UniProtKB/Swiss-Prot annotation:
It holds the Pfam family Response_reg. It comes from Vibrio cholerae serotype O1 (strain ATCC 39315 / El Tor Inaba N16961). Its main location: membrane. This is CAI-1 autoinducer sensor kinase/phosphatase CqsS. InterPro entries: CheY-like_superfamily, HATPase_C_sf, His_kinase_dom, HisK_dim/P_dom, HisK_dim/P_sf, Sig_transdc_His_kin-like_C, Sig_transdc_resp-reg_receiver. It is a multi-pass membrane protein. The gene is cqsS. One of its GO terms (cellular component) is plasma membrane. The modification 4-aspartylphosphate is found at residue 618. Residues 191-416 form the Histidine kinase domain.
C-alpha cells in the first residue's frame, strides 16, 4: 500500500477533535453556497446534486458517534474519502466547469488551506490532492459535454503551488513542535516510571523485612512484645535506608522536572554562591549505589570562586554528570572534580577514567533526546546541563579519549564580570521593593533608582504598614526604617509579627547616631543597613540584599540599642496573681527591679515609701481600679505625680481607650500581650 492504514488512523486521530465543527460547516455550507452562487452572484455553472452529496458526506462526520460500533471502525477511511471528495475534487471540478473563473480559483485556494489543516500528513495530503485533481479532470472531460477553453490556467499554478508548499512547511514546523512536546511528555512519564521502580522495590523489600520481625495478628496471643538490641538496630537501619530511598526518589523526580521544564532554568532565584560549598554538598548528597562509588569521587580545590546562579540547578547539573560517569565506569574507576580559575573564567572540571566517548559523537551529546548505548536513558541530562550553564552566562564543553577518559569543563563568568552584571540588571527588572518609613530622602533615592532600573517600588509609613495583612508583603526586598517604626512603641512588634511570614529579604534601616529602645525579634532574619549607606550607594545596597544574602553577616548587634537600666524599679499592679507573677518574672529577667501590688489602693503606699520609675497597672480591679488610681496620682502634690503609667486592659474599644487617655495614663497594652510587645513598651518609657 502507498499509504498504510496506521498512517490513515493517525491522520484521523489528529483531525478528530475538530471534525464536529468541520462537519457542521460542510453539511450546512455546501447547500447554502449553492444559493449564493446561483442567485446572489450567479456563476456559469452550479451543481446542486454534487453539493448535496458533499453535505451528506459531512453529515456522516457530524453524527459519527451515533453510528453503530461496527461502522465506526471504518471512520478513518470514510474521513479520508470525504475530505478528498469535498475539498480537492469538488473545488477542482467546479473550477474547471466554470472555466477557471477568478471566484472559483480563489475558492480552490481556500480549500487548499482547509485541506492542509485537516490532513496533517504531508505525503497523504499531496497524494490525495494529486489524485482528486486528476479525477476532476477525468470527470470534466470524460463525463460532461462541457470542455473548458483552457486546459490549465498557468498563471494560477504558481499561486497554488506556493500555497501547498509553504502551507505545508509552516504546518510541518508546528507539527514538529507538537510532536516534540508529546515526546517530552512521554519521556517524562517513562522517566518517572523508570526512576521510581527501584526506590519502590527497595521500600517493598524493607517492608517485607519489617513484617518478618513482628508477629502476625492471627497468631498474636500477647498484648506486649519485646525486641532485642539486634532487632532494634535492624529496624533503625531499615528505617534509615527507607529514608535514603525516599530521598533518592525525590531527587530523581526533581531532576526529571528540571530537565524538561524550560521555566525551571530561570534566573529568578539566582544569587551569589560559593562553588566549593555547592559542590561539596552535591558530592555528599548524590545517591550513590554503594560505598565504593562514593569513595571513587575526589574533589580538588585549587582556586575557589563565587558564581552567580542557582545552587540547586548546579547541583542537578553535577548529578547528571556523575550519573553518566558511573554508568560508563570500568575497573579501577575514579572521578576527579577540580575547581580552578583562569584569567577570564572560573572552571569546574569533571574528569573520569571511564570508557570515553567516540569523536564523532561529541557534537551530538548535548542535543535533546540524544542517547547512545544507555538503557533507560532519555537524552535529557546533558542538554539540561547546557541550558543551566547558558543561564549562568557560561558554557559546558566535553573532551574525551575513547577507552581512556572523559572530561566535562563547566566555564563560569567571573562574579564581577560584565556578563554577570548584565544578568543582574535584567533580573533586577523583575524584582519588587517596599520601603516602610517616612524619610523622604530615602524615598526619593529609591524612587529614582526604581525608575532607572525598572523594578517595582512602594513606599508606605509604619502606621500604614501595620494595617496591612501578611499577604500584602509579597516583595523581594522589604526595608523597614527603625526611626519610623519606633516612633510609637507598639508598632515594631506588630510589624515584626506580620513580616515573620514574608519570604523576601528584610532590611532594618537605622541611624548610627541614635539609640533604639526596642527588642528586635530574635527569630526574624534581618540585615542591618545604616541610613548613610543607603543614601550614598542605594544600588549597591539593594543588589547585595537581593543577590548576596548568604554572604552577608546579618550582625544585628550593629544596631545601637538603648541599654537596659538595671536600677529601674517597676510597680506591677494587677488583681490576677498569675498575670502579676508572670509579668514580674519577665521583667526581672531583663534586669528590672519589680514591686507588686494587687489593688489600686496600694499604689500610693508603695510610691510614698520607695522610688518607682514606671507603673504597669491593670485598669479593672475590684476595689480601686487603674483609672481611679491614676487620677489620684496625677492629682497629688508629690514628685511622683508625673511618673509614666501604662494601662493594662483586655478591652480595646474606643470608649475604653478614651478613658485611658483622659485618666492621665501615658500608654496602654491590650491583653493578652506577648513578650516582645510588653518589653518594647516598658523599654520605651523607662
Amino acid at each position: 500500500m502507498i499509504v498504510s492504514m496506521d498512517v490513515i488512523k493517525r491522520v484521523y486521530q489528529y483531525a478528530e477533535p475538530n471534525l464536529s465543527l468541520v462537519g457542521w460547516m460542510g453539511m450546512l455550507g455546501f447547500p447554502a453556497y449553492y444559493f449564493i452562487w446561483e442567485y446572489w452572484f450567479p456563476q456559469s455553472y452550479e451543481n446542486l446534486g454534487l453539493r448535496c452529496a458533499a453535505a451528506v458526506l459531512f453529515g456522516g462526520l457530524v453524527f459519527r458517534d451515533s453510528m453503530p460500533k461496527k461502522w465506526q471502525r471504518y471512520m478513518p477511511g470514510y474521513f479520508l474519502f470525504t475530505i478528498g471528495f469535498c475539498l480537492p475534487f469538488f473545488f477542482a471540478f467546479m473550477m474547471l466547469m466554470n472555466d477557471w473563473s477568478t471566484i472559483w480559483a480563489m475558492s480552490f485556494m481556500a480549500s487548499i488551506f482547509l485541506h492542509i489543516l485537516l490532513v496533517h500528513d504531508t505525503r497523504v495530503m499531496a497524494l490525495q490532492a494529486l489524485f482528486s485533481v486528476l479525477v476532476a479532470y477525468l470527470a470534466v472531460y470524460g463525463l460532461t459535454d462541457f470542455h473548458p477553453t483552457t486546459l490549465i490556467e498557468w498563471q494560477y499554478i504558481p499561486i497554488f503551488l506556493f500555497t501547498y508548499v509553504f502551507g505545508n512547511l509552516c504546518f510541518f514546523r508546528n507539527q514538529i513542535s507538537h510532536e516534540t512536546k508529546v515526546s517530552i511528555a512521554k519521556t517524562f512519564g517513562a522517566g518517572i516510571a523508570h526512576e521510581m521502580r527501584n526506590p519502590l522495590s527497595a521500600l517493598k523489600t524493607s517492608i517485607d523485612v519489617v513484617r518478618t520481625m513482628i508477629p502476625k495478628p492471627q497468631t498474636a496471643a500477647h498484648t506486649d512484645y519485646s525486641l532485642d538490641a539486634q532487632e532494634l538496630d535492624l529496624l533503625h537501619q531499615i528505617l534509615n535506608e527507607a529514608d535514603d530511598v525516599i530521598y533518592s526518589g525525590n531527587n530523581a523526580i526533581d531532576l526529571l522536572l528540571t530537565s524538561i521544564d524550560e521555566n525551571r532554568v530561570s534566573p529568578a532565584s539566582f544569587k551569589k554562591h560559593s562553588v566549593v560549598d555547592v559542590i561539596e554538598k552535591a558530592v555528599k548528597t548524590f545517591p550513590y549505589k554503594n560505598a565504593a562509588d562514593q569513595h571513587s569521587v575526589e574533589l580538588e580545590v585549587h582556586q575557589p570562586f563565587d558564581f552567580f546562579g542557582s545552587d540547586t540547578l548546579l547541583t542537578y547539573a553535577l548529578f547528571n554528570l556523575l550519573k553518566n560517569a558511573f554508568y560508563y565506569q570500568k575497573e579501577h574507576f575514579s572521578v576527579c572534580i577540580s575547581i580552578e580559575q583562569t584569567s577570564e573564567h572560573n572552571l569546574i572540571r569533571v574528569r573520569d577514567n571511564g570508557v570515553g566517548i567516540a569523536p564523532e559523537m561529541l557534537e551530538d551529546i548535548f542535543r535533546d533526546f540524544y542517547t547512545f548505548g544507555k538503557n533507560g536513558s532519555y537524552g535529557l541530562g546533558l542538554p539540561f546541563c547546557r541550558k543551566v550553564m547558558s543561564a549562568f552566562g557560561g558554557t559546558i564543553r566535553c573532551a574525551s579519549q575513547q577507552g581512556q577518559w572523559t572530561e566535562f569543563v563547566l566555564s563560569f563568568p567571573r562574579y564581577d564580570s560584565d556578563t554577570v552584571n548584565e544578568i543582574k540588571t535584567e533580573l533586577l527588572k523583575t524584582k519588587s521593593l517596599i520601603y516602610i518609613g517616612s524619610n523622604q530622602a530615602i524615598v526619593r533615592e529609591l524612587n529614582q533608582l526604581a525608575v532607572e532600573d525598572e523594578f517595582g517600588f512602594t513606599a508606605i509609613s509604619a502606621q500604614q504598614a501595620v494595617r496591612r495583612q501578611d499577604y500584602e508583603f509579597e516583595f523581594d526586598l522589604i526595608l523597614l526604617d527603625l526611626d519610623d517604626a519606633t516612633a510609637q512603641g507598639e508598632l515594631l512588634p506588630k510589624l515584626e509579627g506580620t513580616l515573620s511570614f514574608a519570604e523576601g529579604c528584610i532590611g532594618y534601616v537605622y541611624d548610627p547616631g541614635k539609640t533604639y529602645a526596642v527588642n528586635i525579634n530574635r527569630y526574624l532574619r534581618i540585615q542591618p543597613i545604616s541610613i548613610h549607606s543607603i543614601l550614598r550607594k542605594p544600588r549597591k545596597i539593594i543588589e547585595r540584599l537581593l543577590f548576596e544574602q548568604e554572604s552577608l553577616s546579618m550582625n544585628r548587634n550593629v544596631i545601637p540599642l538603648q541599654k537596659s537600666r538595671h536600677e529601674r524599679r517597676i510597680l506591677v499592679v494587677d488583681d490576677n496573681q498569675s498575670i502579676r507573677t508572670f509579668t514580674a518574672i519577665l521583667l526581672e529577667q531583663q534586669g528590672y527591679e519589680v514591686v507588686q501590688a494587687n489593688d489600686g489602693s496600694e499604689v500610693l503606699k508603695h510610691m510614698e515609701s520607695q522610688n518607682i520609675d514606671l507603673v504597669l497597672m491593670d485598669i479593672e480591679m475590684p476595689n480601686v481600679g487603674g483609672l481611679e488610681a491614676t487620677r489620684l496620682i496625677r492629682n497629688s502634690e508629690h514628685e511622683y505625680k508625673n511618673i509614666p503609667i501604662i494601662g493594662y486592659t483586655g478591652d480595646n474599644s474606643p470608649k475604653t481607650l478614651a478613658l485611658v487617655q483622659t485618666s492621665g495614663m501615658n500608654d496602654f497594652i491590650v491583653k493578652p500581650a506577648d513578650r516582645d510587645v510588653l518589653l518594647n513598651k516598658v523599654a520605651a518609657w523607662v
